[in-house]
Amino acid sequence: MNKEDFSKRVLHAEDSLYRVAKSILHSDEDCADAIQNGILKAFQKLDTLRNDQYFKTWLTRIVINECYQIIRHAQRYVALEEYPGWGAEAVSEIEEESPVMSELMRLEENYRLPIVLHEIEGYSIREIGRILKLSETNVRNRIFRGKALLRKRLEGVI
């Protein structure tokens, strides 16, 4: 794969990468960092991609790893409550999007990420298994349990 093909494929996957990163990190700045670092690493390791058909899956896995790297190395854990009014505003902005998205973002990551990858990004169960390094059965179970939790949380809302 040459530089031009790489650039085209990255541009095609950009929105998807952002949504996946956002489901893990929540902060736009951290998402941008994770995506930028992931793309750089992918370009540097392009020779390790065995099959061009799996480029997007491979790149998504790299970005997810970068998200986890940012979480591990974050030195600043600040509670929203320490900034009066800011926390409430941030939560209300998310809730204005839709109650379903709001509750989805509140799910535990091990349920949220497979649902985002499958329902929003359109990845197959097999691809999600490769990305998250899980069996297909485990992916199906997490999606099923995550949706059950969502239904339960949304019973009185929708």
Which residues are covered by each model-predicted region?
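A short, charge-rich alpha-helical start-of-domain segment used by transcription regulators
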Residues: 1-19, 23, 32-35
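Residue-level preference for hydrophobic side chains embedded in well-ordered alpha helices
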Residues: 9, 13, 17, 38, ...
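Conserved RNAP core-binding helix
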Residues: 18, 28-45
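Sigma70-family region 2
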Residues: 37-54, 73-74
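Arg/Lys-rich amphipathic alpha helix in sigma70-family domain 2
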Residues: 50, 61-81, 145
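DNA-recognition helix of helix-turn-helix
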Residues: 64, 132-156
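Internal acidic/polar
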Residues: 69, 76-104, 124
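A short pre-motif secondary-structure segment
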Residues: 114-118
